C-alpha cells in the first residue's frame, strides 16, 4: 500500500480526482469506488490503450457528465475540487519515446477551455506570443489570447461552449495531421535542416491555433452584443 494523509480535505481535494480518472479509464474495475473512497489503487490498468488525447481529457476534467460538475447546478455542483478549474494557469504533457521527435504539449490558461499545442523536441524558437504573459492583460500574449476566449465563453456558457468545442475539435484534428506529416518527413532531415523543419512545424500550428482563438473571441464578442441589458425592443407596428 501507499500511505498518505486521509483527512476531510483529501475527501474533497484529492480522492475525487483519482476517482474521476478511474471512471474515465478503468470503469469496469472501479464500479465500487466513490469520490470519497479512501482505499484507491495506486496503479490501475486502463480498459483500453490510452492516447495523448485521453491524457488531455483527464487533465481537462471537471467531473463533466456527473452531478459534481461545477458548470452544472444543484447542491453537489461545487462539492469537490476538479482537476481543471479557473485557477489553472497552464498544463503540460510530455510525450516521450516517439519514433521521431518527442513532443511537449502545452495548454495555456484553463485547459478545459484551451487547446494543447504540440512543440517538438529540437526546436530552436517559439512564436513571440508564447514569450509574453505578464500583467496587465495583453492580447499579443498567447496566455491572454486563450484566457480572453475562455472568459468570454464563461459569460454565456450554454450558448458559447459548443462554439469553443468546435474550435478545439478542429485544432486537435489539425494537430494529428501536422504530426503525421512531420513524422513522415523527419527521417530524411539531419542537423540544422531538421531543427529548422521542426521549428517551422511547431510555430505554424501554434500560430494557427492562436489565430483560431482570436477569431473565436471576435465571434463571441459579436454575439454578446445581443445580450446587452441596455436595449429596447421596438414595437413592430411602429
Question: What is the meaning of each model-derived region?
Answer:
Residues 1-238:
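C-terminus-biased signal that marks the final domain/tail of proteins
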Amino acid at each position: 500500500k501507499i500511505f498518505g494523509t486521509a483527512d476531510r480535505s483529501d475527501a474533497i481535494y484529492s480522492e475525487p480526482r483519482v476517482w474521476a480518472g478511474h471512471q474515465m479509464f478503468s470503469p469496469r474495475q472501479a464500479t465500487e469506488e466513490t469520490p470519497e473512497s479512501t482505499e484507491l489503487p495506486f496503479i490501475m490498468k486502463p480498459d483500453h490503450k490510452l492516447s495523448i488525447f485521453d491524457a488531455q481529457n483527464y487533465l481537462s476534467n471537471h467531473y463533466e457528465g456527473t452531478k459534481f460538475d461545477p458548470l452544472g447546478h444543484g447542491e453537489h455542483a461545487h462539492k469537490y475540487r476538479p482537476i481543471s478549474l479557473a485557477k489553472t494557469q497552464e498544463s503540460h504533457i510530455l510525450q516521450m519515446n516517439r519514433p521521431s521527435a518527442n513532443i511537449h504539449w502545452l495548454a495555456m490558461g484553463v485547459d478545459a477551455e484551451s487547446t494543447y499545442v504540440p512543440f517538438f523536441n529540437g526546436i530552436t524558437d517559439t512564436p513571440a506570443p508564447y514569450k509574453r504573459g505578464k500583467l496587465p492583460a495583453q492580447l499579443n500574449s498567447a496566455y491572454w489570447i486563450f484566457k480572453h476566449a475562455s472568459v468570454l465563453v464563461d459569460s454565456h456558457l450554454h450558448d458559447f461552449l459548443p462554439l469553443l468545442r468546435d474550435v478545439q475539435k478542429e485544432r486537435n484534428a489539425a494537430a494529428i495531421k501536422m504530426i503525421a506529416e512531420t513524422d513522415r518527413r523527419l527521417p530524411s532531415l539531419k542537423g540544422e535542416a531538421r531543427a529548422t523543419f521542426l521549428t517551422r512545424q511547431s510555430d505554424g500550428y501554434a500560430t494557427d491555433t492562436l489565430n483560431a482563438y482570436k477569431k473565436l473571441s471576435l465571434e463571441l464578442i459579436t454575439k454578446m452584443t445581443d445580450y446587452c441589458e441596455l436595449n429596447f425592443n421596438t414595437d413592430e407596428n411602429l
